[in-house]
């Protein structure tokens, strides 16, 4: 009888580095590798515990004097779009979305590059090459999909694959209790369409159709303009010291705390 058990994941701590969200703060992260047959199960457990995935690595903040990064997930079964969100949906009625295996394309990378060059020129991803992008998409041992968003053009049938330009893309993990938006990007020339909001609304729809109660949005930092959009999608839960707590928009759940 084989009594061997699967090895437990090993966790590591990064060296301190400048925080990309808060001035005069240093960040550290705890991380582990997710490979092999247990990777999907481990991804579920870690994401539910506040980790995020990047390629085959799961990480979460482990800063010594700050707890400002708060994991956020939308409660899809209770979600109802606001008036402004309904306007976004109406304005993008001609968009067609389709789900594919996690495989990169030159069209995706060209859009990704335009997005970074316009929105994140000084970010940590600003110098990513086409090979880096391919690794970001393909290096996964979990249930990952690419969702492409295109404009329908004249001549497209209802059931046809859209032939219009690629205007947005999302890299998404399917988990047992929801969808996790790993990374998304869009055409910066179409900012009036609010494509970031549209993709989140589309993920809420997809999760509902699959009977999944959550859409995971990653981290939110109060006062960060980069992350302010995440708290518009209510109701949602924030991962606090006692577990996932419902967020109403009234309490200051991101006040930095010290140990």
Curated annotation (Swiss-Prot):
<dbReference type="GO" id="GO:0071596">
    <property type="term" value="P:ubiquitin-dependent protein catabolic process via the N-end rule pathway"/>
</dbReference>
<dbReference type="GO" id="GO:0005737">
    <property type="term" value="C:cytoplasm"/>
</dbReference>
<dbReference type="GO" id="GO:0008914">
    <property type="term" value="F:leucyl-tRNA--protein transferase activity"/>
</dbReference>
<comment type="similarity">
    <text>Belongs to the R-transferase family. Bpt subfamily.</text>
</comment>
<dbReference type="Pfam" id="PF04377">
    <property type="entry name" value="ATE_C"/>
</dbReference>
<dbReference type="InterPro" id="IPR030700">
    <property type="entry name" value="N-end_Aminoacyl_Trfase"/>
</dbReference>
<keyword id="KW-0808">Transferase</keyword>
<protein>
    <recommendedName>
        <fullName>Aspartate/glutamate leucyltransferase</fullName>
        <ecNumber>2.3.2.29</ecNumber>
    </recommendedName>
</protein>
<keyword id="KW-0963">Cytoplasm</keyword>
<dbReference type="InterPro" id="IPR007471">
    <property type="entry name" value="N-end_Aminoacyl_Trfase_N"/>
</dbReference>
<dbReference type="InterPro" id="IPR007472">
    <property type="entry name" value="N-end_Aminoacyl_Trfase_C"/>
</dbReference>
<dbReference type="Pfam" id="PF04376">
    <property type="entry name" value="ATE_N"/>
</dbReference>
<comment type="function">
    <text>Functions in the N-end rule pathway of protein degradation where it conjugates Leu from its aminoacyl-tRNA to the N-termini of proteins containing an N-terminal aspartate or glutamate.</text>
</comment>
<dbReference type="GO" id="GO:0004057">
    <property type="term" value="F:arginyl-tRNA--protein transferase activity"/>
</dbReference>
<dbReference type="InterPro" id="IPR016181">
    <property type="entry name" value="Acyl_CoA_acyltransferase"/>
</dbReference>
<keyword id="KW-0012">Acyltransferase</keyword>
<dbReference type="InterPro" id="IPR017138">
    <property type="entry name" value="Asp_Glu_LeuTrfase"/>
</dbReference>
